[in-house]
């Protein structure tokens, strides 16, 4: 919200997010620990309603924890992506293991027939490795559109696959 120039308040967050938890845990674990019912249908319906009400040609539906992260005890983030049938913007950051994690996510998305609109590789802080290196390694094995977001350079600093 803040990045979009919106005021962050409990009301503004609840208008776009069905559940929000303090602990940085997979959604199913966070819901279980908070005593919140894990209702995949409610999550899917809420998200579809948000998309409809926005009336926009684009909608960012942010997942938590990655493509294969459990959303509920019986559904993964990738299940929601497939049910919504939206193009995927995959976000990665350069760290040890990122090549493997990113290629695995790409393969999982491809196996489900999900369109990867772009892979955004961000640099979370100035000390992080250059995102271009991760882009080069990913592109060595899989051809996907890639955009780079260097630290402090704005949303999209360059396009590694152009």
Language-model segments: residues:
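N-terminal phosphate/diphosphate-binding loop that engages ATP/GTP or pyrophosphate donors
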Residues: 1-37
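Beta-strand->loop->alpha-helix junctions that form or flank phosphate-binding loops
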Residues: 14-19, 120-123, 144-154
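Glycine-rich phosphate- or other oxyanion-binding loops that anchor nucleotides, phosphorylated ligands
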Residues: 33-48
């Amino acid at each position: 919200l803040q990045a979009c120039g919106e005021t962050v308040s409990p009301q503004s967050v609840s208008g776009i997010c069905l559940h929000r938890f303090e602990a940085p845990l997979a959604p199913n674990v966070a819901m279980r620990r908070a005593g919140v019912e894990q209702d995949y249908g409610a999550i899917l319906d809420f998200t579809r309603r948000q998309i409809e009400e926005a009336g926009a040609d684009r909608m960012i539906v942010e997942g938590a924890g990655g493509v294969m992260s459990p959303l509920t005890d019986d559904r993964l983030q990738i299940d929601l992506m497939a049910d919504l049938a939206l193009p995927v913007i995959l976000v990665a950051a350069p760290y040890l293991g990122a090549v493997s994690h990113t290629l695995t996510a790409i393969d999982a998305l491809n196996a489900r027939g999900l369109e990867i609109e772009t892979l955004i590789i961000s640099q979370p802080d100035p000390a992080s490795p250059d995102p271009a290196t991760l882009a080069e390694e990913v592109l060595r094995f899989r051809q996907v559109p890639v955009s780079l977001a260097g630290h402090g350079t704005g949303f999209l600093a360059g396009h590694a696959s152009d």
